[in-house]
């Protein structure tokens, strides 16, 4: 056996060397195929970073980025000392943390349930139903939510009341999170469903023969098969804890629910585009990005500690 392994190693090294030599010889071809992606990344990801200088300047449209006077960390001090800072920050954190706690397990549960459906025809129909909401745009979804929860909407008719749910700050987070779960949970379960399809059938059969009940089969056979996918998805979602989209929150906002619906991204939109305070809004956006990076590194570190060194 050792002889076979020793013979295999040089072959593997030779194969790798051949690949490297081929790439070096045909580097123009690889560069040709990589160029569109590289250009798009540079133009839309890296070049706009020059605009971050606005966060440290008293930006003037006429003078431009290079001609505007430097103010240093003034905008950051102004934002952090603002009486509304903690309210906007907590609104943002509550939405994303509650969404993560309630929304993250749902795709996993859906995938586990889908894995239990034996008839292919029924399984495809169920998949179609749970995948469809993902293709509804955010604005259309918000319109549907407003119609459903209006004082004369279906929900109030069913309950026999005439409550305007969209004006209640206490109901905003539930509406936001529940509608998000309905829209994205089915589509998010695809990766888990694909991973479960590759789970060892022999192991499942052995567990059944050993007398394992349904919960034991899920805990000891199916969940370990998708553990790596769960870890990666959790890290990615936790890393975006401050990057909650402004479109949905803005579309569901009313004057009455602002105490709960005004988040950092809607605040940036209001002071940046509506009030024209570009430097201040850029500083708030940069604050968001820095917190995201810190949280991503921290969550990845925690997951590695809890998962035997496995993370991103």
Model-derived regions, located:
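Short, Lys/Arg-rich, polar N-terminal cytosolic tail immediately upstream
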Residues: 1-23
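A structural signal for multi-pass alpha-helical bundles of membrane permease subunits
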Residues: 22, 26-312
């Amino acid at each position: 056996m050792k002889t076979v392994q020793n013979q295999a190693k040089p072959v593997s090294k030779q194969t790798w060397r051949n690949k490297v030599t081929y790439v070096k010889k045909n580097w123009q071809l690889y560069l040709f195929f990589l160029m569109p992606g590289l250009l798009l990344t540079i133009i839309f990801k890296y070049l706009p970073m020059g605009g971050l200088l606005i966060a440290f300047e008293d930006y003037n449209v006429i003078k431009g980025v290079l001609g505007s006077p430097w103010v240093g960390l003034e905008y950051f001090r102004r934002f952090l000392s603002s009486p509304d800072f903690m309210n906007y920050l907590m609104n943002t954190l509550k939405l994303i943390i509650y969404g993560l706690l309630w929304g993250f397990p749902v795709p996993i549960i859906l995938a586990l349930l889908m894995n239990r459906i034996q008839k292919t025809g029924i399984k495809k129909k169920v998949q179609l139903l749970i995948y469809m909401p993902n293709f509804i745009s955010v604005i259309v979804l918000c319109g549907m939510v407003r119609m459903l929860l209006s004082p004369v909407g279906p929900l109030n008719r069913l309950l026999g009341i005439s409550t305007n749910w969209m004006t209640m700050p206490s109901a905003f987070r539930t509406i936001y999170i529940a509608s998000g779960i309905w829209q994205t949970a089915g589509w998010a379960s695809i990766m888990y469903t694909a991973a479960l399809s590759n789970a060892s059938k022999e192991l499942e059969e052995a567990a059944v023969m050993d007398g394992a009940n349904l919960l034991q089969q899920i805990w000891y056979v199916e969940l370990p098969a998708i553990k790596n996918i769960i870890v990666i998805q959790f890290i990615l979602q936790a890393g975006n804890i401050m990057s909650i989209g402004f479109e949905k929150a803005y579309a569901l906002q009313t004057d009455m629910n602002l105490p709960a619906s005004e988040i950092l991204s809607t605040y940036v939109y209001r002071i940046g585009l509506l009030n024209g305070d570009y430097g201040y809004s850029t500083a708030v956006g940069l604050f968001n990005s820095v917190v995201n990076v810190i949280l991503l590194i921290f969550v990845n570190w925690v997951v590695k500690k809890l998962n035997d060194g496995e993370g991103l």
